[in-house]
Amino acid sequence: LQLYMHEGGYCRNKHVGDYLDYFKKAEQVAKDIMDLQYYELQAEFKDIWSPQNQHNNEIIFALPSFPIPVMGNNFLAHVLPTDYKSQQGIPLTGWNGFRTPWEVYDSFDPADKRRQVHKTEYWNGKEMVTGRTGTLEYGALPMKYQENANTDGTNDASEYVIYRYADVIMLRAEAKNEIFGPDGGGTPTAKELLHQV
């Protein structure tokens, strides 16, 4: 899918070949995947990455992870502040790295499900750290990968999600938009596909 989309965009931008052929191929592959009726969107956005919900039907491709160096998912360690303490008693390492800038977080509608996978406060073992100063000065904590008790403190066993069914739907919408525009091409239209996600 992504290769066809890339090639379609390249041909369109460089004015070489028939770029629509690539978008048509991408749309067909996405349709074929959707027609399998095997994959589905999760009812709760945050559950896509939940340790209790691994191998769910939204995930098309994920890297398995184990709670050991080199084989583990250490995304959470990159996110957590160095003084973060798990309220569940899970020993976790924090490197104080990744943040979602406040201007991006604030651009989400209050009802936007992406807010569910961000923390705007955390426990440091003594008190809740809140506000937009100190370790939270640069943004919210992007915690789509939640605390997982199956961890060595840095590396946990949460699958690292690479490709989701939502990606298929969005790419099909993009391909249909390139071919037919937002409202053409029969149902579902590009707009209708977009609103599924």
Task: Map each language-model feature to its residues.
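Short coil/turn linking the two alpha-helices of tandem helical-hairpin repeats
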Residues: 6-15, 178-182
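Elongated scaffold/linker segments in the mid-to-C-terminal portions of large proteins
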Residues: 28-35, 39-179
